[in-house]
Amino acid sequence: MGLLSNRIDRSSLKPGDHIYSWRTAYIYAHHGIYVGDDRVIHFTRRGQEVGTGTVLDLILVSSGPSRNHTHCPTCVPPNEGHGVVSSCLNCFLAGGVLYRFEYSVNAAHFLVKARGGTCTLAVADPNEIVVHRAKHLLQNGFGCYDVFKNNCEDFAIYCKTALLVLEGRTMGQSGQAVSIIGGPIAAVLSTPMRLLTTNVYGMAATAIGVYCASRYATDIGMRADVAKVEAEDLTRRLSSGLFQVLDPPLAAIALPSTS
């Protein structure tokens, strides 16, 4: 892996790796946890998802492995009760390129990766613990799929860190969810600052600054509203209804002060 690309060869995969592959012309990526023996555990939409009612739903439907009519002899039939599934690596990639998500990156590295959903400032737990969490959630589920609060990237980041956002009105861990809506929001919120400059380059720099600040502030490794919740406790709370997926308002994205 390098500064500009997280692409890796299959030979370098280790159990516990958080991997992903781009879908739909690089608009969105599908994420999962490699658990060894050519297997990937990942979170998909299986008819229980909370959608947006927008074109994003069509994009995210295609983020998971394609459901073709050819039966894969090595893949485990999915549990229809929840969206956590185990697939072979080929089915997970669905013809795409393999990438590895990075953890414990520094601030400069994080901001250079302008596209969200490729790295985080958060520290990952040991790989054997990551695999245990993924396998536990395969048996017990990860709640209801939500585009912004509980998607495949949120699942993989949780398996790696056990960190959860506890405040229901804010966004989940997903960096690519912030990227999808962060750009338009940055453009809107930087509009008042355009009064301070008529230079087109200054306007662009302002919008980029707001976008980068929002990505940095909402990264799971920087947020103050997160807690470590182990998988057994998480699934117990999910089954008892103590955790619920709610639609977060866009205003929940942290932004820099203009004062």
UniProtKB/Swiss-Prot annotation:
Keywords, alphabetical: Cytoplasm, Stress response
Summed up, the tissue specificity of this protein is: Highly expressed in inflorescences, siliques and stems, and, to a lower extent, in roots and leaves.
Example GO biological process term? lead ion transport
Q: What induces it?
A: Induced by lead (Pb) stress (Pb(NO(3))(2)).
Task: Write down any Gene Ontology CC term.
Answer: cytoplasm
* One protein family per Pfam: LRAT
Active-site residues (renumbered): H30, H42, C152 (acyl-thioester intermediate)
What role is this protein assigned?
Confers tolerance to lead ions (Pb) stress mediated by Pb(NO(3))(2) probably by promoting Pb accumulation leading to subsequent glutathione-dependent phytochelatin (PC) synthesis and related gene expression, including PDR12/ABCG40, GSH1, GSH2, GR1, GR2, PCS1 and PCS2.
User: What PANTHER family does the annotation carry?
Assistant: OS05G0310600 PROTEIN, PROTEIN LEAD-SENSITIVE 1
Q: What is this protein called?
A: Protein LEAD-SENSITIVE 1
Species assigned in the record:
Arabidopsis thaliana
Which gene specifies this protein's sequence?
A: PSE1
